[in-house]
Amino acid sequence: MTLQRMALFCALVAGLAPLTQAQPLSRSDTPQATERLRTRLAERVQERRAPLPPDVQKITDLPYGPDARQRMDIYRPSTSTPDPSGARAPVVFMVHGGGWRNGDKAMPSVVQNKVARWVPRGVIVVSVNYRLLPDTPVSQQAQDVAQALATAQQQAAQWGGDAGRFILMGHSAGAHLVSLINAQPALAQRLGAWPWLGAVALDSAMLNVPQFMRAPHLPLYDDAFGTNPVYWHALSPFHQWVSGAPPAQFVCSTERPDQPCLQAQAMARHVHTLGGRAEVLPQPLTHGEINAELGLDSDYTRAVEGFMASLDAVVAQKLGR
């Protein structure tokens, strides 16, 4: 290994520094093909977008960086009734999935049911975009999400939110990214973030990245994580978890052949050995249903809300717990 590559890997382990070289891509993954796919996705999002409930206001495309993907949407109550205690609204900070190369903050599965359930109860929902493969490596995607978190906390008071009552949430690739940030809070705090309450990871298969990458897997994971074990370790929530990290809930599908619940259970045991709090919520739902059905009136939604309510008395009050 050259000195240059050794320095790069040390930087990744120390702080998830951006890669200077792109991760390997499949031969069919050209910039033109990727852009066409993203355009079709954006068109489908527009076609399927449901109207907002009348008591919800949306603030669209707030920037947290110069790139067009570095944007977030804010969903808040359209009429604000002051809390008798003077407390500001808790915030769910949602990160979409899409294999680290696709997805959008406005997809109905990402926001529709969550917004419809939580915003009328006085919980703000922030939905975040971030830069994607092949242009932006996963290490820098984590930096994007951390910067979005810091910016959202800094601006929260402007739209009625409480910077100290954020709950991180993500699905699939987004669940990996929020788990990684939650595992090592210093990553976001270096960018100006304040402490948050905890995280809900919706069906991530990448809690222990080295273990997953050493087993048979789809090529998309090679595109995202490459072949170097040092890079895997730097992006692995299991290996990056530090004592004192906020609590986490790992929701996992019992319907997937790759059995993400086994990884979630091992992750929870590891967190417990470090003195932390983590719980696993297995669900007989598909990978997509775990995201899309959160917010429906169901035992599943109530179980997630139970974890959220356990983090803070104001959150519990807003959720009616």
Task: Please report, for each region that a protein language model flagged, where it lies by residue.
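Mobile cap/lid helix-loop segments that gate and shape the active-site cleft of serine hydrolases
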Residues: R48-P54, A205-Q240
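Conserved alpha/beta-hydrolase "acid-adjacent" motif
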Residues: P257-Q265
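Primarily recognizes the serine-hydrolase "nucleophile elbow" in alpha/beta-hydrolase
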Residues: A150-R214
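C-terminal catalytic histidine-bearing segment of alpha/beta-hydrolase fold enzymes
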Residues: V251, Q265-A268, H272-R321
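Short amphipathic alpha-helix adjacent to the substrate-entry channel of hydrolases
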Residues: A106-V126
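Alpha/beta-hydrolase active-site loop
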Residues: T136-A157
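N-terminal cap/lid segment of alpha/beta-hydrolase-fold proteins
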Residues: S26-P84
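Short beta-strand/loop motif that positions the catalytic acidic residue
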Residues: G244, F250-S253
